[in-house]
Amino acid sequence: MALLFTGACGYIGSHTARAFLEKTKENIIIVDDLSTGFLEHIKALEHYYPNRVVFIQANLNETQKLDAFLNKQQLKDPIEAILHFGAKISVEESMRLPLEYYTNNTLNTLELVKLCLKHAIKRFIFSSTAVVYGESDFSLNEESPLNPINPYGASKMMSERILLDTSKIADFKCVILRYFNVAGACMHNDYTTPYTLGQRTLNATHLIKIACECAVGKRKKMGIFGANYPTRDGTCIRDYTHVDDLANAHLAGYQTLLEKNKSEIYNVGYNQGHSVKEVVEKVKEISNNDFLVEILDKRQGDPASLIANNAKILQNTPFKPLYNNLDTIIKSALDWEEHLLRFQ
């Protein structure tokens, strides 16, 4: 059996592909249009796992191309599950370009589910987000009300509903993983080679990556968007998760889906909140470098606090966090940025 990953030339998808290649026997088919992904990630996976990765450059809206591929694939090596990472992910951009988010995220998920039903692909792992919850000042569990305050969160919430409704009427089951804030780089990287995995995102919007870019001199300054939120220091609080732990959460969710054949939703986080100011100061401390930080206006659509209640995934799957430490996350992100300086 094979696994099909969408968007796995990107940050989270590539790390998850590595985890599956390392810990399962399945071959992996990666579909990505390279609009935000990187061939370097495919090269790294192919280098360490030769003859186990197939890459197809395609957009998920190219349904005829994907349909033709699946017609052939299902005859020779049927797909056990789809892991769907392909999506737009910027809260700020979604406020400006909402229709792009509903098209790219929601509509493409709908078309992918239709292909699953047509080709008898019965299992689906979906990358969702804590942003579906909206504003909150407490630890969020999977039963917390959904109230997204931006089109990004709304597009993911609607995608979740498509999957869950389909699972009620078809031989089709899904695991939905609601990510909190992901950071860090692969803990298995060999930085003497170019065959590495990490966040290559251009013009990144992720706090830890931006702060680490400042620390290694790639940026002259950074901004904190809002310092008057109702939090302990006025800046937003987030639950930061190491990308390798998130990858392993996908593996645990997949294994549980195979075992129980039941659709489930899981938060993936550490149930620990760190403020923006705390993260920036920690990056300065670990890197031993100071850099300019400006206080800017709030970004529209940013919740004040998002912290995961992770009890469900810990109690009901094999998932066990390995890198549940802000220092560890930041150190791996700094190592990655220094590596990029050497190999770019």
Features from the language model and the residues they span:
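C-terminal substrate-binding subdomain of Rossmann-fold SDR/epimerase-dehydratase oxidoreductases
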Residues: 111, 213-344
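Residue-level signature of the cytosolic catalytic core of signaling kinases
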Residues: 58, 200-204, 272, 322
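N-terminal Rossmann-like NAD(P)+-binding domain of SDR-like oxidoreductases, especially those catalyzing
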Residues: 1-185, 336
